[in-house]
Structure formats: C-alpha cells, structure tokens
Amino acid sequence: MRAELAVYFIAGTQDIVRGTLPGVLEEALKAGITCFQYREKGAGSLQTASERKEMALECQQLCAKYQVPFIINDDVALALEIGADGIHVGQNDEEIRQVIASCAGKMKIGLSVHSVSEAEEAERLGAVDYIGVGPIFPTISKADAEPVSGTAILEEIRRAGIKLPIVGIGGINETNSAEVLTAGADGVSVISAITRSDDCYSVIKQLKNPGYPS
C-alpha cells in the first residue's frame, strides 16, 4: 500500500478548471500518478446519484487501464456497487466502524486523521489500511478544512510509533512535497497541484522525484 500512496491524486468534477475530469485523470495517469480518489463534493459537484455513478465508472475504467487503484470518497454504497479498490472516509463522514463492517476484506479502507490520538485510534481498529493526515498546508480545495497542522503532525504521529501507511494532504505541491515526505509521510495527495497545472507531467514527475528538474 505504501508505494501506491506515492502520488495520490484526488478530484471530482468540481475541481476541474480546464477540460473534463476523465481527460485530466487520463493525463495524470499517463504522467505516473499511483492512486486516484474520486471525491465528488461541494459547490459545482455532480448532484444526482446516477451522474456520480456514471462518472465513477468512467474514472474506474481509466484507472484499470493504467493499473492504478481507484478509491471512492465517502460513498460506501457506490464503492461496493461498482467494486472500487478502496473507500476513504473522514472523521465526520460515515462512521468508520460501519465502513469496516461493510468493506473490510473487499477493498482498502482509508481514514482521514488530524491528531496523534485519531491516528492511534485508526491503528487500534485494525482494519484501516492507511491514514490521510492534514491539512499540512493551507488549501483552496476544501472549504470545510480543519486547521492547518504543518509537517509537525507527521513527525508526531511517527514518534508515537504509528506504523500505518501515511499520505499527507492539504496544500501540497511540487515545491513543498519533499518536506512532507521527510517528516514521515509515505506519499502525498494533491488536487489543485494537478487540476490547475498547465503541465501535469512535470508536476507529477517532481512529486514522485522531489529532485526532478522543473
């Protein structure tokens, strides 16, 4: 799982400023993302279940073509219906124990955490496959984001002995990703660093190899 978290792209239709979500996703897949999470939330997102399912299936097919895990954010029913590779939930989304009961053994389970205690609880549950930690830096992609924690939270979680794979989230881009990895994350998750880029190939190469020339 750790290798799959290296460059973890998150997006929904609400994040796309040029082109379409499938178009942006395929470019990102060609450039080398290692995981994709379909997150359809907030202003500008698809509103009906049928629209979300249709988009999820199109994105899932693209991920399968490039052999990259396809994860759905906070929609267990849809993830189970289409056979997603994983489900990701936040602290205020579907109750994690219910998610585990429905999904354990069928797909990977990811959980967002914002503190050492939440990370410790995720590890105690025994069925969480990885944790998303943040927001590390200020973000424009999530209106209801938690307070910024900085990279220190990653160091604190690792010092506490948490062994779960960690992906950092929140305001991460090709200029600061090295800090996130140095602090203890196994990978970085990005939204706008890819969706708002004119050259996602270069961005993704730099995210995968922080020393890669820009």
From Swiss-Prot:
GO biological process, one term: thiamine biosynthetic process
Molecular-function GO terms, alphabetical: magnesium ion binding; thiamine-phosphate diphosphorylase activity
Cofactor note (record): Binds 1 Mg(2+) ion per subunit.
Highest taxon, organism lineage: Bacteria
Pathway where it operates: Cofactor biosynthesis; thiamine diphosphate biosynthesis; thiamine phosphate from 4-amino-2-methyl-5-diphosphomethylpyrimidine and 4-methyl-5-(2-phosphoethyl)-thiazole: step 1/1
InterPro entries xref list: Aldolase_TIM, ThiamineP_synth_sf, ThiamineP_synth_TenI, TMP_synthase
SUPFAM superfamilies assigned to the protein according to its UniProt record, in alphabetical order: Thiamin phosphate synthase
Positions with a binding annotation for Mg(2+): D74, D93
Keywords: Magnesium, Metal-binding, Thiamine biosynthesis, Transferase
Family per record: Belongs to the thiamine-phosphate synthase family.
Name of protein: Thiamine-phosphate synthase
Gene: thiE
Enzyme Commission (EC) number: 2.5.1.3
Keyword Protein transport: no
Cofactors: Mg(2+)
Database matches in NCBIfam families: thiE (TIGR00693)
Residues annotated for 2-[(2R,5Z)-2-carboxy-4-methylthiazol-5(2H)-ylidene]ethyl phosphate binding in this entry: T139, I140, S141, G171, I191, S192
